[in-house]
Each structure stands twice: as structure tokens, then as C-alpha cells.
Amino acid sequence: MENSQLCKLFIGGLNVQTSESGLRGHFEAFGTLTDCVVVVNPQTKRSRCFGFVTYSNVEEADAAMAASPHAVDGNTVELKRAVSREDSARPGAHAKVKKLFVGGLKGDVAEGDLIEHFSQFGAVEKAEIIADKQSGKKRGFGFVYFQSHDAADKAAVVKFHPIQGHRVEVKKAVPKEDIHAGGGGARAARGGRGGGRGRGGGGGGGGRDQNGLAKGGGGGGGGYNSYGGYGGYGAYGGGGGGGGSYGGSDYGNGFGGFGSYSQHQSSYGPMKSGGGGGGGGSWGGRSNSGPYRGGYGGGYGGGSF
């Protein structure tokens, strides 16, 4: 399960006075930090009231998550797994869910196989594989239900998983109303603590990919200028982009566009040695050891701020 992206945590709601040394001083109690940054306005150098820490291994990041809630300089802060730059604009990438969509399932995969695989990320309540109501034929996708949000976040960060020798794709199962179907825009954000009030911006366009999966367009403007509210993180600002949910209709009614998923299973193919990694890589050109400074802007809304 070792994946560098799982070692990276987002910290929101920081005190405007919290420095990088102060942030490091708090979180290094749970392990060795390979990177620590408080995001600031490049012109004013004023804190944007959020930041990131990267641990040397997943176990240390897990320990920090397990110790939540954290209070830093008098503020109770929010911890989440950091979403990679390339995935940050995907609709629902920052959603707080316990349910994941799993696509590209082969016919020999059983619900028990899903439970066994995904239990490495945290306790699984149940798994279901969707079948055609008339024929009973499996439709090539299903859902996994976790007991905690962090377990779902961890599994979603990896993105591609090996199940029965084949690569499957994992996405957060975000309800239609939460993803602003049809490319609806992000809601206006509220200002950060001590950091000024952001303006609500326009929403991005939505769409669908060839599998009928929700495909986001541009992210909503949101607060914190072009950051889209921490790039779509929780209630700190605008959501992360538009897009139709499950192909544009409620998945309870034929699972929307997911019904066509089985037609494209072959695109996943057998797992190859070393395959299946996801969510890693550099943020804006920096190496994994220092993924934020100078590179995070593109993944969290970009633009000037």
C-alpha cells in the first residue's frame, strides 16, 4: 500500500500567525517530516491559513490522522489526505465520503474480493457489484463502503488498484446534488480566518467521458481568489469543478452513465509489474520530497492569489 501521496496531509483552518516552524513543531511529534509548508500570498507574504505536511512513511501520516482533532496556535485545524495536483480538479476529488465507485471489474471478481482488497485502507462495511436486473450479468462496476472518511480518502488517492490480476479504477461516489450536475458552479466561499474574505467565482463547465463517468470542467472560482476554496477542500470555499454525477443522472435510476462502463473494461487490461500506482509524482515540477512550494498552485486552482 506504500504510496508517496498517502504520506501528504492537507491542514486547513490555520491561525494566520502560524509559521512553518510552528506547524512543523506540532506535527513532527507524530513522525519525521520531509516537507512542511504554510501557503502564503506571494505579494503580501500573509498566510493563506492552510498548509501541507509530508511524512516519511504512511504509518506516520496515519498516526497524525488518528490523533485528530489537532489544535495549532489556538485553532482547531482540519486534516485530510492531500489530493495530487493532477487529480485535484476532478469533480468530487475533495468530497467527504465513505463510499467509493470501483470500475473495470472483471466477471470473476466477487464482492468478497473487494472487501479483502480494500480492507488494507481501513474497515469496510460492505461491497456491492452491480448486475443487470433482467439478465443478472455483472455490469463491470461496483461500490465499496468504508467505516471512515479517511479510509475512503486513502483508497481514492491510490486511484488504480490490482483486483484479481486486473487494474480497476476507483473514484469517490459523490451524489448528484453534491457535484452540481451539468457543470454547476462552485458556491461562493467565506473568507479565511484573519486572511480576508474571498469572492465567490463562476463555476466550471462539466461533461462526461467515454465511460459515462463524471468529468469535470474548470473548477469553480470560489474564495481565496483562484484557489477555489483550498482547491475544493471541504467548506473552506468553492467546490472543485463541475460535471455531471454518474454520467448525468441519479445512479439509483440505472446508475446513470455507469451503465456503459462494462463496454470499456478492456481499457484496463491485465496488471503489469509495477503497475497500479496512482496519485504520486511531482506537484508543479517539484520532486516527491518537496511537493508543494512553487508547485501546488496549479493543483489547487492556480492563478494569482
Curated annotation (Swiss-Prot):
The modification Dimethylated arginine is found at R293. One of its GO terms (biological process) is response to lipopolysaccharide. One of its GO terms (molecular function) is mRNA 3'-UTR AU-rich region binding. The modification Omega-N-methylarginine is found at R139, R286, R293. There is a cross-link at K80, K96, K98, K99, K106, K154, K159, K172, K176 (Glycyl lysine isopeptide (Lys-Gly) (interchain with G-Cter in SUMO2)). Residues 7-86, 98-175 form the RRM domain. The modification N6-acetyllysine is found at K133. Residues 181-211, 272-284, 292-305 have a biased composition (Gly residues). This is Heterogeneous nuclear ribonucleoprotein A0. It comes from the Eukaryota. Phosphorylated at Ser-84 by MAPKAPK2 in response to LPS treatment, promoting stabilization of GADD45A mRNA. The modification N-acetylmethionine is found at M1. SUPFAM superfamilies: RNA-binding domain, RBD. It holds the Pfam family RRM_1. It is found in: Nucleus. mRNA-binding component of ribonucleosomes. Specifically binds AU-rich element (ARE)-containing mRNAs. Involved in post-transcriptional regulation of cytokines mRNAs. One of its GO terms (cellular component) is nucleoplasm. The modification Phosphoserine is found at S68, S84. It comes from Mus musculus (Mouse). The gene is Hnrnpa0. Its main location: nucleus. Keywords: Acetylation, Isopeptide bond, Methylation, Nucleus, Phosphoprotein, Repeat, Ribonucleoprotein, RNA-binding, Ubl conjugation. Residues 178-211, 265-305 are annotated as: Disordered. The keyword DNA-binding does not apply. The modification Asymmetric dimethylarginine is found at R293.
